[in-house]
């Protein structure tokens, strides 16, 4: 395992966990070997919960402590390159939130690619038709290839028979 090619990813709450690992400092267990970073080298986030602030997902649960666990409120220089995939009709994660996240990432000099899928909602990639699973898999492949984490042409394409 190449420790310089660790990718964290997830959808929805899993995307929150991955983004937290990449952006929030101080989550290490004091008993672990702190010489080994637990910060991933890249993030792949599908309709991620990245804002836990007022009027956002999870705020009622965390209230004033949201800044401790809200990825969008913890972006800093050195944040890992990130790919975000989301539907334009997501009723849980507003597109404006992921656009703000992308802006914040660019402000600190970190790469953040955003791919919008027209007229689909939350978790669109995990529901029929299979075309969205294929399309998101292709985008992830291209992103990881652009980072040289994988090489070669994608083995899947948008014309895949599903």
Which residues does each predicted region cover?
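Conserved serine/cysteine hydrolase catalytic core
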Residues: 71-79
């Amino acid at each position: 395992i190449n420790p310089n090619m660790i990718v964290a990813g997830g959808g929805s709450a899993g995307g929150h966990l991955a983004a937290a690992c990449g952006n929030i400092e101080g989550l290490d267990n004091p008993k672990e070997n702190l010489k080994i970073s637990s910060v991933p080298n890249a993030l792949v986030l599908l309709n991620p919960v990245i804002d836990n602030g007022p009027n956002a997902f999870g705020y009622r649960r965390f209230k004033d402590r949201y800044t401790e666990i809200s990825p969008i409120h913890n972006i800093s220089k050195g944040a890992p390159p990130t790919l975000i995939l989301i539907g334009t009709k997501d009723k849980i994660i507003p597109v404006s939130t992921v656009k703000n996240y992308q802006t914040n990432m660019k402000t600190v000099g970190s790469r953040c690619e955003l791919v919008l899928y027209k007229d689909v909602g939350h978790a669109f990639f995990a529901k029929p038709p299979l075309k969205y699973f294929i399309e998101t898999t292709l985008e992830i492949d291209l992103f990881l290839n652009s980072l040289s984490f994988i090489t070669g042409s994608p083995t899947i394409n948008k014309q895949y028979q599903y």
